Amino acid sequence: MKKLRYSEAFYSVQGEGKFVGVPSVFLRSFGCNFRCQNFGLDRDRPKEKHNPEVADLIASDKLNEIDKFEDLPIIHTGCDTYASIYPEFKKYMMDKDVDEVVEHLLSLTPEGKWTMDNGQDIHLILTGGEPMMWQKFWPQLLEHPRMQDLKNITIETNGTQQITKPFLEVLASRPRIKLTWSCSPKLSVSGEAWDKAIRPEVVATYKHGLPNSDMYLKFVVKDSIDVNEVHKAVKEYQLAGVECPVYLMPLGGRSEEYELNEQAVADLAMQQGWRFSPRMHIALFGNAWGT
């Protein structure tokens, strides 16, 4: 039985995308094929192995003094979930089998189940890291007896990992579950290469044979340069048959930076007829772990 390596699971409100404000349990898997180390830095900065803040943290003695994941510092640049992607932080991860993961998830819900007595349902968000790197584990999770009242799943993915046949078959066998693909392709502001980050041929396969699924594209942007890239990317996705809503979300892993970009990005979204996604958890909680 395969175990899942994950950094955290928590109960909060969804802060981004289509389901903003919906009570949700988040399961953050470990590992990602990207580093996104340039978020918040100069766009033309040379790509390095680590984001500068992460590099300084790894090189310091601070990690010897930190025992728990939730005590790791929040960084101001790069990927805001850095501890879920860099191998240097493996020691803070949990490795649990499916029974343990299910028990952990349900313990976070108000009533110990996905569908509450009042008829409202709690959403499950598979996030990361890159959750599509754990496709061998997710079928175990969805097939577990205590997951059978789950009604809504969102998979937050960068849209670069091909869906496997076994995972697709399990999803197709559960039409009672509403599946939403929240695809967040990475633009050049992230520091990732276009040909590796923009993979429309991959995203186009996510809904095949899944009539009870939905999808949207969500781009992290800062300025008009990013918007020009969004236009280019959306055209490539459309040519591959991906027709879905497009969201713009402000760059900013901390309240100060987010607030500076929020209004400008909302204006850019309205000018293009695209949707605006806030990062409500930052406004509410300051982008702390477990939010």
Predicted regions and their residues:
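Well-ordered, non-membrane alpha-helical segments in soluble/globular domains
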Residues: V98-V102, I198-V203, V230-K232, E259-Q263
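Conserved Radical SAM active-site core
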Residues: L4, N38-I177
